[in-house]
From Swiss-Prot:
Active site as annotated: 70 (proton acceptor)
Enzyme class: hydrolase
PANTHER family reported in the protein's UniProt record: BIFUNCTIONAL DTTP/UTP PYROPHOSPHATASE/METHYLTRANSFERASE PROTEIN-RELATED, BIFUNCTIONAL DTTP_UTP PYROPHOSPHATASE_METHYLTRANSFERASE PROTEIN-RELATED
Protein name as it appears in the record: dTTP/UTP pyrophosphatase
EC number: 3.6.1.9
Organism expressing this protein natively: Bacillus velezensis (strain DSM 23117 / BGSC 10A6 / LMG 26770 / FZB42)
Keywords: Cytoplasm, Hydrolase, Nucleotide metabolism
SUPFAM superfamilies to which the protein is assigned, alphabetical: ITPase-like (SSF52972)
Any one Gene Ontology cellular component term annotated for this protein: cytoplasm
Its biological purpose: Nucleoside triphosphate pyrophosphatase that hydrolyzes dTTP and UTP. May have a dual role in cell division arrest and in preventing the incorporation of modified nucleotides into cellular nucleic acids.
Catalysed transformations (reactions): dTTP + H2O = dTMP + diphosphate + H(+); UTP + H2O = UMP + diphosphate + H(+)
Gene Ontology biological-process annotations: nucleotide metabolic process
Disulfide bonds: none
Marked site positions, Important for substrate specificity: 13, 71, 153
Length: 189
């Protein structure tokens, strides 16, 4: 018997990506507070957050298979969250301008008796950005709900010179790796 699949996320991007798999699922947003532990590496932090999100939803739905995910943008060993305002978005984009950074997405798939968590890292390189480029992009309001203040799947694609890794991981869910992991939980497309 196939268990009910739940995506523990309110991210519209993760929903779109999970829809690519053409498997039935429901959405229950996790209400966990996203706090980073300064004693952990970025990879460990993003994995912990993904596990916490999945675990919180699983606690209320013990007969389900739950997917939790989290994405971080890191540069110079520092993780950039979602900007709180336009000034913080501009600061983040200036830091990323003309440089490479890492986008780390962790996925945790959990049932009452099993947990699989994995991380996927993609290197993204930005074009050098002028102050006008930055301000025009901020005007779109696209940076405001995204880690690192950009969305590669939208107008933020114009900022990106190249990527080395999984495009879908940068968007928020490494689709192929997630599907392979779901097969281990007897969920198939």
């Amino acid at each position: 018997m196939t268990k009910r699949l739940i995506l523990a996320s309110q991210s519209p991007r993760r929903k779109e990506l999970l829809n690519l798999l053409q498997i039935p699922y429901s959405i229950i947003a996790s209400r966990t507070e996203e706090k980073l532990n300064r004693n952990l590496s970025p990879e460990e932090n993003v994995q912990c957050l993904a596990e916490q999100k999945a675990g919180a939803v699983l606690a209320e739905n013990p007969d389900a298979v739950v997917i939790g995910a989290d994405t971080m943008v890191c540069i110079d060993g520092e993780c950039l969250g979602k900007p709180h305002d336009r000034e913080e978005a501009a600061h983040m984009l200036r830091r990323l301008s003309g440089r490479s950074h890492q986008v780390i997405t962790a996925v945790s798939i959990q049932t009452h008796d099993r947990k699989e968590t994995f991380c996927d890292t993609t290197e993204v390189t930005f074009w050098p950005l002028s102050e006008d480029d930055i301000q025009l992009y901020i005007e779109t309001k696209e940076p405001m709900d995204k880690a690192g203040a950009y969305g590669i799947q939208g107008k933020g694609a114009l900022l990106v010179k190249k990527i080395d890794g999984d495009f879908y991981s940068v968007v928020g869910l490494p689709v192929a790796k997630t599907m392979r992991a779901l097969k281990e939980f007897n969920i198939k497309a």
